[in-house]
Amino acid sequence: MYLYFETQDRDYKVIIDSGKLQSRIMYALSDSHMHKILQSTSLYDKPAIDIIHEQELPYSTAYKKIAELVKWGLLVTYKSEIIDGKRVAYYKSTFRSIKVNFEGALDTKVEAEPNLDALERLTLRFYDL
């Protein structure tokens, strides 16, 4: 993964050159349920139940897709709290925006604007282990 910065208006962009991550991003964007989940969590952290109601997703499908997006690193558990004795996880997309540039079979470029607060949470959680 290659990272470059444009510091004028703090517009950070990441060029993703890992074939595996590119494939996962393109798959997630082409899957309608994953796409809706990423859209819903690109700006604000939300619990799964809010994502399900807001995007009108089937419960079991939504939970499976959320777990897969977390495993791929495209979604992070932003925070969790206990409500009525149950742990509720809030999710946030790792990226604020994603741009895919497809120029034939040999050149596919994926550029993304990271959600810096989501990545910061992920980093803090990693160092807490």
Question: Whereabouts are the PLM-identified features?
Answer:
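Short acidic, hydrophobic short linear motifs in intrinsically disordered regions
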Residues: 44-54
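Short helix-to-turn junction characteristic of helix-turn-helix DNA-binding domains
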Residues: 29, 38-44
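Alpha-helical residues within the helix-turn-helix
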Residues: 53, 70-71
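N-terminal leader segment of winged-helix/HTH proteins
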Residues: 1-25, 72, 81-82
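Short, cationic-aromatic polyanion-contact patches
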Residues: 22-31, 47, 80-102
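Amphipathic alpha-helical dimerization/coiled-coil segments
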Residues: 96-129
